[in-house]
């Protein structure tokens, strides 16, 4: 550890998997003392989109807002990070090895990837491409991001492509909509091109043993806390001040809002800040069996409003409005089922011919 690392303080905005990974890498690879690392989180729980907590609306219910299907060819940084984080069940085994061992015992191979409106399982191995679809796919991959510009996916593909089995599987695996960015789709195609020939079974997926809050977030959180990291919940960062000198820009202070009032954290010469902006689960609202989740349109969540404030300072901080400007085209819904019996689980197993944990995703292609 060099002296500059010993004196450095890290201020991390957001306790999602990215923020906690920064803390863990700083301790493991840079030798920064855990006591010099501070995580500021507006919620009362860590994990970001991978959080897991009792439902605020439904008695005896549980909510996980997001999830991630891992695979061995991608997520290299994730595998590296969790290779040195001990499993909760067996500290002699890393979280990475626990996941890989679990997938040897419980491999993913969907037998019911697509279901039609007549409750029939479709032959998902038939992707449904015609010659025009293949040509349009090749054109998307061949074009540069500059050439694609602001075009949408439906600007690049004909209607037939959106009716193919391939698109039904791809869009429900990666949460793509026809009107989303063509550039974003191209990035996904390039990153996950190895999934093209197995997306009908999702056999490339590596699942965590339990939900990802318990299998990933909790072990990582425990590890950084054991190393002395300072985690502050209910702490909202509302703005960041910067200074520019000799062509170098650095953050100089963080504006903080807590239940106790407003304050500022001054950042010294040896301080660094890492900020998570624009979460896909920002402005989450909750419903129940009897109530509808309200739609939030005014960016209550700080991950977007903070980016708004920062972007006003310099144009190269990006344009967050590009992503949140049309709420109706970017909102999404999810459901977390809390079951107190196994009847539904047995029915799903009987219908899909997949034991629990082996089927990954089931898509009802006529559901909207």
Where are these regions (language model features)?
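Beta1/beta-strand and adjacent pyrophosphate-binding region of the FAD-binding site
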Residues: 2-18, 38
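A short, Lys/Arg-enriched amphipathic alpha-helix followed by its capping loop at the start of a domain
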Residues: 22-35, 223, 227-229
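Glycine-rich FAD pyrophosphate-binding loop
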Residues: 27-56
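Short, solvent-exposed loop/turn and secondary-structure capping segments
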Residues: 49-52, 184, 284-289
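Conserved FAD-binding subdomain of flavin-dependent enzymes
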Residues: 59-99
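Rossmann-like flavin
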Residues: 88-194, 206
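Helical element adjacent to the flavin cofactor pocket in flavoenzyme catalytic cores
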Residues: 191-272, 277-278, 290, 296-300, ...
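Glycine-rich loop(s) and the adjacent beta-strand/alpha-helix scaffold that form part
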Residues: 257-357
């Amino acid at each position: 550890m060099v002296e500059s690392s010993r004196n450095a303080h890290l201020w991390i905005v957001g306790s999602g998997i990215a923020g906690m990974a920064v803390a863990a890498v700083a301790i493991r690879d840079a030798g920064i003392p855990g006591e010099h690392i501070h995580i500021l989180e507006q919620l009362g729980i860590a994990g970001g989109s991978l959080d897991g907590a009792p439902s605020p609306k439904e008695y005896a219910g549980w909510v996980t807002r997001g999830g991630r299907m891992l695979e061995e060819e991608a997520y290299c940084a994730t595998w590296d990070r969790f290779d040195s984080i001990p499993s909760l069940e067996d500290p002699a085994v890393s979280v990475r090895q626990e996941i890989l061992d679990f997938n040897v015992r419980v491999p993913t191979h969907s037998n019911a990837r697509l279901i039609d409106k007549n409750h029939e399982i479709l032959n998902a191995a038939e992707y449904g491409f015609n010659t025009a679809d293949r040509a349009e796919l090749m054109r998307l991959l061949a074009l540069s991001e500059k050439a694609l510009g602001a075009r949408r996916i439906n600007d690049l593909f004909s209607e037939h492509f959106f009716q193919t089995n391939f698109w039904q599987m791809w869009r429900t695996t990666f949460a793509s909509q026809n009107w989303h960015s063509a550039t974003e789709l191209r990035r996904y195609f390039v990153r996950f091109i190895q999934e093209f020939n197995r997306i009908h079974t999702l056999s490339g997926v590596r699942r965590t043993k339990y939900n990802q809050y318990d299998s990933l977030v909790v072990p990582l959180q425990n590890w950084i806390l054991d190393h002395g990291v300072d985690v502050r919940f209910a702490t909202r960062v509302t703005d960041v001040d910067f200074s520019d000198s000799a062509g170098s820009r650095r953050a100089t202070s963080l504006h903080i809002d807590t239940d106790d009032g407003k304050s500022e954290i001054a950042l010294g010469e040896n301080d660094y800040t890492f900020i998570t902006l624009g979460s896909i689960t920002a402005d989450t609202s909750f419903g129940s069996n009897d109530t509808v989740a309200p739609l939030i349109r005014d960016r209550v969540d700080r991950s977007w409003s903070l980016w708004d404030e920062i972007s006003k300072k310099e144009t190269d901080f990006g344009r967050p409005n590009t992503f949140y400007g049309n709420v109706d085209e970017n909102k999404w819904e999810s459901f977390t089922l809390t079951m107190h019996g196994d009847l539904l689980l047995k029915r799903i197993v009987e219908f899909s011919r997949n034991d629990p944990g082996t089927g990954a995703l089931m898509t009802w292609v006529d559901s909207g």
